[in-house]
């Protein structure tokens, strides 16, 4: 079943502001929340659809990608945009992205459900890095060194957030639950613990370097292997090279998105290459050979049939791009562009006029065209 338009899901126009999007989301989420629609089996699916729509439209980069490509922008790859000013971005988890909206909507009403103490360790966020390579590098494969700014585990406290690497202790306010309960009229509501900010544990003596966070900002230098055959949109995952986890949690992953630059000679279509080659009017008329460059740095001689016209294509098999996952290489298509002479001398012009008189029967396309024109005019006057 095809996905619905995200703007339609939220009931807003494509020009809706961030505040209008948030207001529409709050209304829809409150209306469709499963806890309030126990008798409606469709509510949960609709609620997830609303969350998905808001997740995309609330983020400027994701929204721009969706406005341009629709749902196809997120098929086969992860969403998320780059941070402003660089080729690097961060993806937080779903719960943190929507916690402000849900808390305002429902007041975290979870009373009576019980629960277990929260783990203080949290996985780090995934990162995105946009990397540009040349077509030649994409053909051969290349090793690239990139500098990635990211949060890394604090060396001073070994990522614990505590001075000297000491262990955190259970929060005395929430007893490690990360939530506190309060009675409001007939309802028991749960809210994030103000003492530990929902972590369930506190650090008595915070590390002086990271101030209790367990991680610090640092630029890392990483070596990345770019395989032969990559194209724009290829995604490379480096496990564990994302943001460091919070207080001893595992690191996220780094996703590298490839962009292949345009080439001065070749245009690319998947594994195939296209090259437009100029030939003289003499070579096109009489036939001959032309030397064309190939992406591997060499060249190939190609025979031009007599009477070739602009646009005629010839194929060099196996001279295209290598397939990313093996299976050989594509082809190179050569398109002829017959050049019209310019800056002619008086003698050259004289010879061309003489040639024209002698070649009235040697231009089949021209004769066919003007025959059609005559038939068209005769039909108009008849």
UniProtKB/Swiss-Prot annotation:
Record: residues binding Zn(2+) 1: 154, 157, 207, 210
A molecular function GO annotation: unfolded protein binding
Residues the record lists as binding Zn(2+) 2: 171, 174, 193, 196
CXXCXGXG motif repeats: 154-161, 171-178, 193-200, 207-214
Comment on bound cofactor: Binds 2 Zn(2+) ions per monomer.
Protein's GO biological process: chaperone cofactor-dependent protein refolding; DNA replication; protein refolding; response to heat
Cofactor(s) the record lists: Zn(2+)
Highest taxon of the lineage: Bacteria
Pfam families, per the entry: DnaJ (PF00226), DnaJ_C (PF01556), DnaJ_CXXCXGXG (PF00684)
An example Gene Ontology CC term for this record: cytoplasm
UniProt cross-references to InterPro entries, sorted A to Z: DnaJ, DnaJ_C, DnaJ_domain, DnaJ_domain_CS, HSP40/DnaJ_pept-bd, HSP_DnaJ_Cys-rich_dom, HSP_DnaJ_Cys-rich_dom_sf, J_dom_sf
CDD domains reported for this sequence: DnaJ, DnaJ_C, DnaJ_zf
Keywords, ordered alphabetically: Chaperone, Cytoplasm, DNA replication, Metal-binding, Repeat, Stress response, Zinc, Zinc-finger
Compartments in which it is found: Cytoplasm
Family of the protein in this entry: Belongs to the DnaJ family.
Complex and partners: Homodimer.
Protein name as catalogued: Chaperone protein DnaJ
Gene: dnaJ
